[in-house]
Amino acid sequence: MLYHGVDLVEVARIRHAVVRYGQRFVQRVYTATEQADCLAGSGDVRYEALAARWAAKEACAKALGIGLRGLGALAVADRPRAGFHEIEVVRDNDGRPVLRLSGFAAEQAAALGICALAVSLSHTDELALASVVAWAG
């Protein structure tokens, strides 16, 4: 069985949240590893990288059939949700993005019999996209 999730986010939306809420937003949504991956060599924030990781978290949640806690009006009130840190985008030894699940997200993946996840990230200056495919078998 295959499960798929895709998400598209405007980079400006993430930039606005970072500018408005600062580290409070960044720490709430992104793990320390994700934060480090989204800093340019100069230490400047790469908003498109943050947006791509946001999209990956959303796409993964869609593939798992769950929502993310903290999305306010976008979340369905009675639907179980995973925390932002429970879906983490890390890099493998070759630099490719991979997903690391924990907590409720990992429990849901196990309940669906998911044995592998693949994530693809892409972005322009304005938009970030993520696609997640989950294999159960």
Curated annotation (Swiss-Prot):
A cellular component annotation (GO) from this entry: cytoplasm
UniProt catalytic activity: apo-[ACP] + CoA = holo-[ACP] + adenosine 3',5'-bisphosphate + H(+)
GO molecular function: holo-[acyl-carrier-protein] synthase activity; magnesium ion binding
E.C. numbers: 2.7.8.7
Intrachain S-S bonds: none
Main location: cytoplasm
Subcellular localization(s) per the UniProt record: Cytoplasm
Enzymatic class: transferase
Amino-acid positions noted as binding Mg(2+) in the UniProt annotation, renumbered to this chain: 7, 58
Keyword entries, A-Z: Cytoplasm, Fatty acid biosynthesis, Fatty acid metabolism, Lipid biosynthesis, Lipid metabolism, Magnesium, Metal-binding, Transferase
GO biological processes: fatty acid biosynthetic process
InterPro entries, sorted: 4-PPantetheinyl_Trfase_dom, 4-PPantetheinyl_Trfase_dom_sf, ACPS, Ppantetheine-prot_Trfase_dom
Cofactor: Mg(2+)
Function: Transfers the 4'-phosphopantetheine moiety from coenzyme A to a Ser of acyl-carrier-protein.
Family of this protein: Belongs to the P-Pant transferase superfamily. AcpS family.
Record protein name field: Holo-[acyl-carrier-protein] synthase
Species assigned in the record: Chloroflexus aurantiacus (strain ATCC 29366 / DSM 635 / J-10-fl)
Protein encoded by which gene: acpS
